[in-house]
A protein has these predicted regions:
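N-terminal accessory beta-strand-rich subdomains and adjacent acidic, glycine-rich linkers
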Residues: 4-268
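An acidic-aromatic substrate-binding cleft motif
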Residues: 239-308
């Protein structure tokens, strides 16, 4: 039988509606109108699909209102205020949804004794209209996604509708969708560790984006610019080999009513794992002007500068 769960933002403007039937889907609702929806699942090597024919064991809701110290950021502290819903499923996995006043995030979790191999993660972000976007393609026009995975992530943003985007080229995050009336939703990710970064590609003829992940490297060789890069020559048939008990990357959606809210949003900072650097007394924040690029050199110092050791 279908089951429905929901969690709202602290100010009640944004809501996530989760539907559990033969698969798991969720919708983001703002001001009683659906912004987007998606099916979510994670396929393990061997064929097990986390999210297929799911059986809910427990749903836990919590409210958090705390501050995160941010000594090297544009703010001294970051306010972390959200409502969270954790759904635990039979099979030792779960989904976590967080709803902030300025957006939504979700992630998979697993609790297994042995390491697991992830074949793929499903995410298909469907929009109700063919909205305009601000999209950065990979800076490669090569014909296959395999060839496009190797890129510098340096590309201007194109302002095109979802269906007007080139579906033969991968898109990089963050990607911004213009919902009209000044509202926008920014798709990005956070707390990405031991997992490939997410690309997006538009579904042909549909106002939707599908997640694409680079498979894990099997064979690498040194090459590229000045022989400074490791080039992938062959890939495995999975995207990650990782700990069986872990939280996976957050898939985040920043929702703004005007553009200045985007500039002031701290969502990626909030979603990051706590710093593992215990002693930060030696870190002195300041400005740097590409010291690693401009001749790799320093001047006026009492030692021989440069790449010489």
């Amino acid at each position: 039988a279908q089951k429905n769960y929901q969690v709202q933002s602290p100010n009640r403007d944004i809501k996530v509606e989760v539907t559990v039937a033969d698969k798991v889907t969720f919708a983001i609702v703002q001001d009683h109108s659906e912004v987007m929806n998606s099916a979510v699942s994670m396929t393990l090597q061997g064929g097990e699909v986390l999210g297929a024919n799911p059986k809910v064991l427990k749903v836990t809701k919590t409210s958090v209102d705390k501050e995160i110290p941010s000594p090297f950021y544009k703010k001294d502290v970051v306010k972390d205020i959200y409502n969270e819903m954790q759904i635990s499923f039979r099979g030792n996995y779960g989904l976590v949804f967080r709803v902030y006043n300025d957006g939504v995030a979700y992630r998979f979790t697993t609790k297994r004794k042995e390491p697991i191999v992830i074949a793929d993660e499903e995410a298909v972000y469907n929009f109700p209209s063919d909205y305009k976007t601000f999209t950065a393609y990979v800076n490669s026009t090569k014909p296959t996604f395999e060839e496009q995975f190797f890129n510098s992530f340096e590309q201007p943003y194109a302002n095109e509708t979802i269906t007007g985007l080139n579906d033969k080229r991968l898109k990089i995050l963050p990607l911004l969708v213009d919902l009209g009336d000044g509202r926008k939703i920014c798709i990005t990710e956070a707390d990405l560790e031991d997992f490939p970064g997410m690309f997006l590609n538009n579904e042909t003829g549909k106002p939707s984006f599908k997640a694409v992940h680079a498979p894990y490297p099997k064979v690498k060789e040194q090459g590229g610019h000045n022989q400074l890069q490791m080039l992938v020559k062959e890939r495995e048939n999975y995207i990650a080999k990782t700990s069986g008990t872990r939280s996976f990357p957050w898939r985040a959606f920043i929702i703004s009513r005007n553009d200045k809210e985007l500039a002031d949003c701290d969502m990626v900072y909030r979603l990051a794992s706590p710093s593992r650097v215990n002693d930060i007394s030696w870190i002195k924040p300041g400005k740097v002007a590409w010291d690693w690029w401009n001749d790799w050199n320093l001047y006026g110092v009492d030692f021989r500068a440069g790449i010489n050791n």
